[in-house]
């Protein structure tokens, strides 16, 4: 079976988005995961105080890495309800995850088919379906970290690598303010 690039990209997007939509559909109005509750506390603190780094005794590290919650607050400031803003961040993060995973593997192997297969293999893991569908900092940090790899892989073959390396640097800074382990 040979897919066009457009068909492969559509399949990658579907593999990325549908599992998170199905998992979130079980309780669309409330985050029920333990980590999600902890991050919602940090998000609520940022929204109510209009400032970062408010203490969260439930997850002390969370306020020190507010990238996820700050991004959600920015989306919320567009007039979108808090839960909907959080869903936007989760879904966009998932789209970035599958597209940069596909691109990274394609850049490293030279095969667009390998990129699509990498996404399909990752999509069958429980981590992909559940852990990376949560409202938690790794959901945003992993795609950002993988974007660094993708941009550096592209830069090595580029005639003008500086913009790509600049983008990788921005992504590294975003990871640094989003997750303490990634």
At which residue positions do the language-model features occur?
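Membrane-embedded, hydrophobic transmembrane alpha-helices
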Residues: 1-6
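Membrane-interface transmembrane helices that cradle and orient dolichyl/undecaprenyl
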Residues: 145-163
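Active-site lumenal/periplasmic loops and adjacent helix-entry segments of GT-C-fold
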Residues: 9-10, 18-144
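Membrane-interface alpha helices of multi-pass inner-membrane proteins
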Residues: 164-180
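Short hydrophobic alpha-helical membrane-anchoring segments
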Residues: 24-25, 103-107, 150-155, 176-180
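Residue-level signature of transmembrane alpha-helical entry/exit and packing/kink sites
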Residues: 9-13, 115, 164-168
